[in-house]
Amino acid sequence: MKQTLKVSDIRNKTIELQGINGHFPVKLNYAIAKNLKVLIAECETATAQNQKVLDEKAIKDKNGEYVFKNDEIVFPNEKTKKEALKELNNISNLEVEVEIMTVPISTLEMCDTDKYDTPTSKEMAVLEFMIGE
């Protein structure tokens, strides 16, 4: 099922899904793995675009590393910094259509047996975007 998500939401969902590690039905584990693959690919694309913005606008030292001051990347001037931050924010707010493998609620209900781990309420909240018909 195609879903439209902001890049920032994709990053958050990726981190949250990576934190789920239970003994669940095969179909649920497969959907988690498949969706992680899709979400990670989008994160990599966004990271590459962020890198491109920083490479164009940030100050680098003689080794090609970004210069930091007070834990922040240094820019040549305030105008360039604002431009870079705006572009980075635009990337983060981009809406991207991703193909999400959904599972029926009945698959999650299978976890209510001794055979599988029962997802916590936090894990259920993370999995919510994957629940379909």
Mark where each language-model region is.
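A composition-driven surface/loop motif
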Residues: 1-133
